[in-house]
């Protein structure tokens, strides 16, 4: 069955803008999404809409579609005939074709050139205070290393890899292909040696010709003081082994910090909420406040309101790059007693009568604003 025109599928003109394409796709995708539309054929319709949007939303793909329609110019025309040798797939796009015409095919990397090993990632969980003060840790990671038996060659000891007879040691082969521009030659990775340019007749009994084995490596890591959740640290040269004598890759340690039940962290500052009694808030007091650095005495002035914040300078998180420490912010929460005996109630009534039981000007202003909000003023 022939494919419908992509513009027709989305119900737009060929001169439609990118915004018009996106708007049409959103409307149709909501209408035919399988989770919403249970009608027969809705699923296929949704796939057709998605395919059309994928082609028309990308400027390069759209230009290609406008010129060739549903015919893929990368597939050639007419095939290769017997013995044509057209294995290895089509072109990756116009870039490959122009590379072949203008010498870009020479970009093929030397298969025997040294290459850096792959990078690795390790997730380390830290307690709240471990992230603040740092720690020395030892981790174990599985990684690819050169085989000790064959020293990375992949060949049985006493033998050496031979030059690939299919690519002549180049690691690539030339493939002829028909294109809209004519018959061209393109380079492809040799499928017989996987681009290494070598053939191993007798494989190493340890690594079975791979030249590499997986080992578990213990690595000592120094976690710096002040790291935060989601940050990562690079450990140079502790990734996988390089290829053809190339350098090792790097290891990236990603930190996941376990939240604390009392302390909260924002950047290099720490926030805590401390309860005080009604009497302490009214008359003032000195209280002990826990910090990550130890206990600190904090003076509570008389008349302190709930939500008042006090700053303890230098009691936060050490700056990761050095030069200073953050602060700790203490947020006071005044606790009102829930149960009072008769004597306590009488004392409070007497207190209320002497003060007129009125809120202060600041609080009164708040209630005035609230009344206006209810009235819609």
From Swiss-Prot:
Signal peptide location: none
GO molecular function, one term: unfolded protein binding
UniProt entry tagged with the keyword Chaperone: yes
InterPro entries assigned: DnaJ, DnaJ_C, DnaJ_domain, DnaJ_domain_CS, HSP40/DnaJ_pept-bd, HSP_DnaJ_Cys-rich_dom, HSP_DnaJ_Cys-rich_dom_sf, J_dom_sf
UniProt-annotated location(s): Cytoplasm
Presence of keyword Metal-binding: yes
Annotated GO CC locations: cytoplasm
Required cofactor names: Zn(2+)
SUPFAM superfamilies reported for this sequence: Chaperone J-domain, DnaJ/Hsp40 cysteine-rich domain, HSP40/DnaJ peptide-binding domain
One GO term (biological process): response to heat
Residues that bind Zn(2+) 1: 147, 150, 204, 207
Assembly and binders: Homodimer.
Protein name: Chaperone protein DnaJ
Taxonomic classification: Bacteria, Bacillati, Bacillota, Bacilli, Bacillales
Gene designation per UniProt: dnaJ
